A protein has these predicted regions:
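Active-site loop/turn elements of alpha/beta-hydrolase fold enzymes
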Residues: 34, 142, 167
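Conserved beta-strand scaffold positions in the cores of enzyme catalytic domains, especially
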Residues: 137, 162-164
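A catalytic-pocket lid/entrance helix-loop region that shapes and gates access to the active site
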Residues: 32-66
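Conserved hydrolase catalytic core segment
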Residues: 1-45
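Conserved serine/cysteine hydrolase catalytic core
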Residues: 98-155
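Catalytic histidine-centered segment of alpha/beta-hydrolase-like enzymes
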Residues: 165-177, 181
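C-terminal alpha-helix
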Residues: 183-187
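Conserved alpha/beta-hydrolase catalytic His-Asp/Glu region
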Residues: 62-118
Length: 189
């Protein structure tokens, strides 16, 4: 069975790895503000694993901060993540839980943790070379990646199409959602 993958941030990176591993099944990628993991030198592998182990243990010990009301929690998310209030409010709908009279952000702390293993530049190139389908990458001009660096690196991959948009890392949850949806309908086959 063939399929299209769409991913945001780490989900975008994982989509590339899956497409490279299943090149006959994945027929298209739509990636939002993500493409590849930031490469590391191979000699940093042990240090990276150490960070992963440390980060993996930390969430289980950390006491989460409770908020008196929803607005207080949303305001902190706006400040901490530099998000518009409407996007932080959408995140709150999904991720705020009321427990014993206080609001808590309920997210998987492992999303903030270091990866167990990181890929080298050569690994990234090998994975991209194994992808056998068009890749559409929506890049937020205020997003996480270094657009110019990735665009320069990817010029040797003609099946990668860049779509730079105004917006932040979570632009797919904001006004640009319609533009991204239009892009999907234009390019998915």
């Amino acid at each position: 069975q063939n399929f299209v993958l769409m991913g945001h941030s780490r989900g975008a990176m994982l989509s590339v790895l899956i497409a490279a591993s299943e090149p006959t099944r994945v027929k298209q990628l739509m990636l939002i503000d993500g493409l590849l993991p930031i490469p590391v030198d191979a000699n940093h592998a042990a240090k990276q694993m150490s960070r992963y182990v440390s980060d993996f243990r930390r969430p289980h010990r950390a006491k989460k901060k409770g908020f008196q009301n929803r607005n207080e929690a949303v305001a902190l998310r706006v400040k901490a993540a530099n998000l518009p209030i409407r996007v932080a409010s959408i995140l709150a709908e999904r991720n705020l839980k009321l427990i014993d009279g206080e609001y808590f952000w309920h997210v998987d702390d492992r999303l903030k943790a270091a990866s167990a293993l990181k890929l080298t530049h050569e690994h990234n190139v090998a994975f991209l070379s194994a992808v056998n389908c068009p890749i559409h990458v929506v890049v937020a001009n205020q997003g996480m990646g270094n657009y110019d660096k990735f665009k320069e690196m990817m010029q040797s991959f003609p099946w990668i199409y860049w779509h730079k948009m105004e917006g932040h890392h979570h632009l797919h949850m904001d006004e640009q959602a319609k533009d991204i949806a239009k892009l999907c309908t234009e390019h998915w086959r």
